[in-house]
Amino acid sequence: MASFTEEMQKPKLRELLETGIQLLEEVEAATQPTGSKPIQEKVREALKLLEKASDMLSQLDLFSRNEDWEEIASADLKYLMLPALKGALTLKLVGSSKRLGLLQDAREHFMNFLTQTHSYHVADFQLPWAQSSSMEGNPAATSDAQEQNLVAMASQRQTKIQRYKQKKAVEQRLSSLKSAVESGQADDERVREYYLLQLRRWISISLDEIENIEQEIEILRERDSLGETSASRSSPQERPPLKPFVLTRSVAQAQVFGAGYPSLATMTVNDWYEQRQKNEVSPTLQEAEKQAPPSETFTVSEKEEPDLEQKEDEDENALHRMQEWDDWKDTHPRGYGNRQNMG
């Protein structure tokens, strides 16, 4: 009884798929950045629900490899979209350090979806990896690489244009069928057409996303290789020490004209002094006193004494005359003796 109650409480496969699709539509219609926390939480929740739906689908074993899409029930066609939905949600996960791994996981989901829909003949398209392998194995196609690239680019451009037009037509038809199918008023034929158009729409999206993923993976790998190369170049390497170099012209010039200054020192001062002591006899103490000049004395000689006395007398006479002149000016004011206003 308890197991039956638990089974009844478990979400159904249809509910898991519809909730996952609803969360994906909310993420795509949101105005917030994809890397924001609310958006990332919705992406992870949707992936979790779709993973549960995939596990339940594998246990139910609804599809067979030998079937065609016409043999699948109309209500079961929508479950073929599970790998494509997981691939679209994986691309919306944010993580710069894990970006390469996320791209590889998303590519694997899209490849599983395309392989499954191609085997059921849901739409007429060619698998991208099968097309590239056939071109590589054709020797005639590889004879002229430049011409092959031009033809491939033109064909790829035309395919993208055609795919875009088909996608717009499918989306327009889906918008007209969506309300009737979701409300349960559509008959089995319209329900079948609606889910078949949904599968073809996701086929077009998956083909475009795989091309974009391949380009981004190539860019990331080139960036990583450049980073490793720059890191190896920047790592310090042991190098032999640089040897001094001598210009031949400078050596020849020095041999002819010398080193460029008066002389080069050939011995130290101590060596010169020792050599001088060996060649000459050092004078004795008495001879050194005789050769020494007489010491200067700062005492006043007898000849200079009269000169000093005479200079002092002259200074006293000059001072006496100046005093007499000052006294005369005091007794004789300015203009004294000029009685006739002369001068």
Swiss-Prot record:
Disulfide bonds: none
GO cellular component: cytoplasm
Cytoplasm listed as a keyword: yes
Alphabetized InterPro entries for the sequence: TAP42/TAP46-like_sf (IPR038511), TAP46-like (IPR007304)
MF (Gene Ontology): phosphatase regulator activity
Short name of any one Pfam family annotated for the protein: TAP42
Biased composition range(s): Basic and acidic residues: 317-333
Acidic residues: compositionally biased ranges: 304-316
UniProt KW keywords: B-cell activation, Cytoplasm
Tissue expression as described in the entry: Expressed selectively in brain and testis.
Region described as Disordered: 278-343
Family: Belongs to the IGBP1/TAP42 family.
Subunit structure: Associates with PP2A-alpha catalytic subunit.
Protein function: Associated to surface IgM-receptor; may be involved in signal transduction. May be involved in regulation of the catalytic activity of type 2A-related serine/threonine phosphatases.
Protein name: Immunoglobulin-binding protein 1b
Source organism of the structure: Mus musculus
Gene: Igbp1b
